[in-house]
A protein has these predicted regions:
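Hydrophobic faces of well-ordered beta-strands that scaffold small-molecule active sites
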Residues: 20-22, 42-44, 68-72
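Mid-to-C-terminal alpha-helical segments outside catalytic/metal-binding sites
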Residues: 91-152
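Bulky hydrophobic/aromatic packing residues
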Residues: 35, 68-70, 81, 107, ...
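Divalent metal-binding pocket/active-site signature
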Residues: 1-38, 50-54, 58-59, 63, ...
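Active-site gating loops and adjacent loop-to-helix segments of metal-dependent hydrolytic enzymes
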Residues: 66, 72-74, 88-96
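Generic structural signal for secondary-structure transition and capping sites
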Residues: 16, 65-68, 127
């Protein structure tokens, strides 16, 4: 969280991949603008609904909607009014509605924009998967032998 500018410097120095997502965005409006100017995405979790998170709502309002994503960060960061319970995908509409209310737009319109943005970043279920960037985080090319689940 305290390394926002450091990560931008690193990405600028080594070269950012085609798609950069700031997972569970926690920066302020100025940092949000910096990220968006580079064409990167800001993904907001349930924290944007928290009473004390005006800085996140300001960041949300500071960037073009084409740079926005939404996430659960499950099982953490459950949106208000369900804080204290495990987060899950079924609670995402609460986050989207709160985002839409803050932006002064219709939740369905924002949901459509978020869905479109998500497909641009990750592809969709009907298409071939979006290629992962090469490097240590690329998906394995051979199956991984996992131990069986259950008591040890």
């Amino acid at each position: 969280r305290d390394a926002h500018l450091d990560i931008v410097r690193v990405l600028d120095r080594v070269g950012a991949p085609d798609r950069v997502v700031f997972h569970c965005f926690s920066g302020d409006a100025a940092f949000a603008e910096l990220v968006a100017r580079r064409g990167w995405y800001l993904s907001f979790a349930g924290t944007v609904t928290f009473k004390n998170a005006q800085n996140l709502r300001d960041a949300l309002a500071a960037v073009p909607r084409a740079n926005l994503l939404v996430e659960t960060d499950a099982p953490y960061l459950t949106p208000t009014p369900f804080r204290g319970r495990p987060n899950s995908a079924y609670l995402m509409p609460h986050t989207v509605r709160a985002m839409a209310a803050h932006l002064g737009t219709d939740a369905s319109m924002l949901a459509a924009q978020l869905s479109s943005n998500t497909e641009l970043v990750y592809g969709n279920w009907d298409d071939e998967p979006v290629d992962a960037p090469p490097g240590p985080f690329a998906p394995p090319t051979t199956p991984i032998d996992l131990p069986p689940l259950g008591p040890r």
